């Protein structure tokens, strides 16, 4: 006699299917928005419930994107640059890493509280279709190990992910959401907490990365009110942040 009859197996698959469909709705913000019919009101940054600080994953996307992210960190340093925080800094060029280190020198962080993760660029400027496919594939593969490491280190801890700008953010968000969907541990699995901040330069339309992460980021932030009204009703507007 088989361990599970066909009826039992079908019932088990049905239960698992319903569970993961429910998880998918919970994990993908645009699905929650579609089901609820209105945007969730969320604070911009998570507030730690203890004195241990938060685990903060920040991606520096090079050039102007890095500049905006560093200004964001400094403008909200009480929460984001708290000495009790643990930092996971993703970067795609050495200059961005150096700029971050230069910025945090005055805050006297302990070295063990800052962890760096190099990410390959998802797409180079003016790259052709074939070159883009190659770089995206490379970023998918190498990015997974970084995201998995960060995910496991922040499991069960108050944490926040800050993204802005480049296409690599889409890959980071993809892996975070996939792992959140697949890995469910009661009392430890507490979401990805991804905040995506659209560039200050985006006044009338979303960037390509923004259009993708509008569907996937837990909190999607625009810095111009007319952009929220015209193009991104699910987004949050807190004024100019950078």
Curated annotation (Swiss-Prot):
The chain crosses the membrane at residues 7-24. It is found in: Endoplasmic reticulum membrane; Nucleus membrane. Gene3D superfamilies: Glycogen Phosphorylase B. The keyword Methyltransferase does not apply. InterPro entries: Oligosacch_biosynth_Alg14 (IPR013969). GO terms for molecular function: N-acetylglucosaminyldiphosphodolichol N-acetylglucosaminyltransferase activity; protein-membrane adaptor activity. It comes from Candida glabrata (strain ATCC 2001 / BCRC 20586 / JCM 3761 / NBRC 0622 / NRRL Y-65 / CBS 138). Keywords: Endoplasmic reticulum, Membrane, Nucleus, Transmembrane, Transmembrane helix. It comes from the Eukaryota. Belongs to the ALG14 family. It is a single-pass membrane protein. One of its GO terms (cellular component) is lipid droplet. The keyword Transmembrane helix applies. Residues 25-242 are cytoplasmic. Involved in protein N-glycosylation. Essential for the second step of the dolichol-linked oligosaccharide pathway. Anchors the catalytic subunit ALG13 to the ER. Heterodimer with ALG13 to form a functional enzyme. This is UDP-N-acetylglucosamine transferase subunit ALG14. GO terms for biological process: dolichol-linked oligosaccharide biosynthetic process. Residues 1-6 are lumenal.
């Amino acid at each position: 006699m088989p361990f599970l009859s066909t009826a039992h197996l079908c019932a088990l698959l049905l239960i698992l299917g319903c569970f993961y469909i429910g998880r998918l709705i919970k994990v993908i913000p645009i699905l929650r928005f579609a089901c609820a019919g209105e945007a969730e009101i969320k604070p911009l940054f998570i507030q730690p419930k203890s004195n241990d600080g938060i685990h903060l994953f920040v991606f520096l996307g090079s050039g102007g994107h890095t500049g905006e992210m560093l200004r964001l960190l400094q403008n909200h340093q009480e929460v984001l640059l708290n000495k009790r925080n643990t930092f996971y800094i993703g970067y795609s060029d050495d200059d961005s890493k150096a700029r971050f280190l230069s910025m945090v020198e005055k805050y006297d962080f302990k070295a063990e509280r800052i962890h760096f993760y190099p990410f390959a660029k998802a797409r180079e400027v003016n790259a052709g279709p074939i070159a883009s496919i190659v770089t995206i594939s490379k970023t998918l593969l190498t990015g997974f190990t970084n995201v998995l490491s960060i995910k496991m280190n922040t499991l069960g801890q108050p944490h926040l992910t800050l993204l802005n700008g480049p296409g690599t953010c889409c890959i980071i968000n993809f892996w975070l959401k996939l792992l959140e969907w697949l890995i469910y541990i009661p009392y430890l699995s507490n979401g990805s907490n991804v905040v995506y901040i659209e560039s200050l330069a985006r006044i009338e339309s979303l960037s390509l990365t923004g259009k993708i992460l509008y569907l996937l980021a837990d909190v999607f932030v625009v810095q111009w009110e007319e952009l929220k009204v015209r193009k991104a009703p699910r987004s949050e507007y807190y004024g100019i942040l950078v």
